[in-house]
Amino acid sequence: MLNTLPTDLCANTPSITIRDNRGFAIIALTYNRTNTHQAPEQLINRNHYNALSLLAASRDPRLEVDNFRYQYSLSGVPLRTDSVDGGSTLQLADSAGRTVLTRDAHHSRRWVEYETGEHSLGRPLSYREQANGGLKTVTDRFFYGENSEQDKGCNLNGTCVRHYDSAGLQALISQSIIGIPLQQQRRLLTDTKGPVDWFGEKENWGTRLSESPFVSHSTTNALGQLITQTDAKGHIQRMAYNRAGQLIGSWLTVKNGVEQPIVYSLTYSAAGQKLREESGNGVITEYRYEPQTQRLIAIKTTRPAKKDRPTLLQDLRYDYDPVGNILAIHNDAEATRFYRNQKIVPETTYRYDALYQLIEATGREADTNGIQNSQLPTLASLNDSNQFVNYTRHYHYDRAGNLLKIQHTGASQYSTHITVSDSSNHGIQQQDGITARDIRSQFDAAGNQRQLQPGQPLRWNSRNQLQQVEPVPRNDGISDSENYLYDGSGSRVVKISLHKTHNAIQTRSVIYLAGLELRSQYNGNNLTEDFQVMTVGAAGRAQVRVLHWESGQPADIVNDQLRYSFDNHLGSALIELDSDGDIISQEEYYPFGGTAVLASRNTVEAKYKTIRYSGKERDATGLYYYGYRYYIPWLGRWLSADPAGTIDGLNLYRMVRNNPVRWSDSNGLLTEEQISMYVNMLSYIGLKNDDELKSELLNYGLSEEEQDQIYLNMPMFTQSGSSSSSATSLSENSSSSGSTRSIDSGYISPIKNYHFFEDINLATMHRPYPIEKVSSEEIMYAAAELKENSHIEVLIGLDLTSKNLQSYKSALADEGIDYITKGKYEIEDFFNEGGLSTEQIDITVNKILKLQESAIVGVHCGAGNGRSGIIASALAINKLYATNEVSSFNVTHPLGGTMPGNKDTYQVDIVTASAVGIIRKTNPQAVERNEDVSALYDYSYLLYTRQHSTSL
């Protein structure tokens, strides 16, 4: 559902890119304002490129110095990066391009040792690290499957089978033929406090590891999807899928128990979006989407009828502006209330500036709420949860996107001020006596915050991972603290909390394993509680956690309690239900993550809720753990600099571009939308692995540094949970799809995504040559395959050329196909921001019309849908104007895009929609983007004006 958009706010606030004579974007201009009475403020981002055409420096609109500076070797390999937020890093590579030495801002060094020898594969053998002024230690050792009968029987040849890392030993016992782990073993360090050192012979390392390993087992189907997963304590999860590979059911068997359903059924739309989900407790969740944009517009959750309880649990409705910002969320399951002379409507509303940063939010909160800080608000009983008041929040930012002030009006009136450095984006909550110049001392050289609150020190390890927080430091004894241990991939595997009481030290520990958390509590040396939390990760939208006590079970909770958590569009846990569908807890959130409403049926059960905002775990410190970083919800910023660099912008502390209502972050690197965008781009341009992506990104003008930040740091390009050393490229795991014929990894069939449109006598297809250099035999085969299957006589290349172009052109000529690949027919895609101009479209269409007088013509682009779809649609537009045959191809839904501003847009719209209908009739994936449609509108209007009085 669309709501009213203040279009005047965005008037005269364009985004402008200025390029140098080499085509590089050197200046990006944006304009912003928060209300229509303000004049737009100009914001200037600058890039500088060196003589090698490599990005040398970037600067944001706020600072007078460069945010980032880059230095390269003579061959263009990145050597050094200087960041005002994250400090200086140095990396050196060997002659094969492999990183052999890195040095971070602390001057901590890491050396990588690789296999050597004539027949070696060049795999990493060890990591050696040395903190500044410390001793050199071996932090990681890698051992690979040999050519033994046992390794061959378990599909382990050449695979990393034992990884000694910073948490202990991770061993792979067996894997499927397509590389999916089937049996794994984890042994943790017995001493989690001291530095790890795997120096010497591995026979001597066993004493440093726990005696009892944690072993997990899995079974998979032919697609590599999990069918069963048996965790380290013997609990079994089972999953089922439909023919499309979508989850349709899941079950859980607690050890020595009876299998019970977690998800009864799931149904999906044709677009793959979830429509209906029935949980094991009988609760049904239904989803609705806006037809044109496929945006989520409603989530409705109901439970089975039962005496003295309502069946409707939540009924969320979403209002959007035309670009996708959420303007309001209504919960029709809640009643409007009146309290303290206020009308309390169960809805939240949002307002944005011209850059789509959130500047105002309204909603409801508990009347007992005070100033938001690291503590949760007062817990209310479910029976007393009706005492709400309205709140309004205003958010203020600087020119670089730093959140400076949160102004709150509601149960309490207060403002949270954030002091930001005048030389970086470092920032902390305002303190007496701390000025912008003093902020530098509050962060270490790598951009890690030194204190959570005044007097609460933070300690970081040599890999810039948070190692310890001391909420209550003591000089004369053991401090209250929370300590963390990470494995070689950077994932947290152990959390230990120490709390001093009058009589003893209370210790709480959590061990994180696949699908399982092992939690325990000690008072001194006495074990007071020991329980396991099974996390059902494939349970649809309703995430389920099962609590199983071995000892110390609380009186108010049944053993093996199922807790179904129902969330919103961000994944934030709103309602917890038990196996009978009764409410355990309810929670509502402010934007940026604070808790506005918190209620539970009893205080004991409330203590065991750990997953909250955005589906992430909230620690006792008040921080949220995202994976790569920790998040400060009461300040709306990250605790440390983004380890992925500028992948989410020059400000390394900004949270989801200051639009936390629309976007979420899955792992502390970048927004979910960006991850989806890159994955879709990979698929859209017809690439199947990260090597091809890197080559293609070069065509889009991205520097090698930017390419590395995209394809090396993103989790979808490595196996989940694997270390950086044993991460597997998609090129090693992915099989080809469609009509791709695997001569070798570089070959792409020229008839992939081939379509012939009889109405316009034109063929479109995927790029008919590989990106990487391949053999002449493969090029000849591809040319023959195209000739045999398409019968085209002329082929026009619409995308940029590659190193195979001339060889392929000659091969096509031998097959009698003329390949036109130069001049104005090489058209830049909309990924390059410029897009297809009306002139380019007009020239190309006229060329095709001329060629069609004597030949069968085809066109190609990266994937055969974008540029090819535009040119095919434009050719259809041209022929519709020439023949006046419109109505038979008319489509009944709007296309999107931007119409030209003139009085004849109705006629132009009919012709454009009819033409796109012709193309989509054969290729439904063509012309999917609004930018493509806008280009076609402009071309259609050009033809309309030429005909002047054309009658439609």
Task: Label the model's feature ranges.
Residues 39, 44, 48-52, 64-75, ...:
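Hydrophobic, small-residue-rich alpha-helical packing segments that form membrane-like cores
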Residues 35, 63-68, 72, 78, ...:
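Acidic/glycine-rich beta-solenoid
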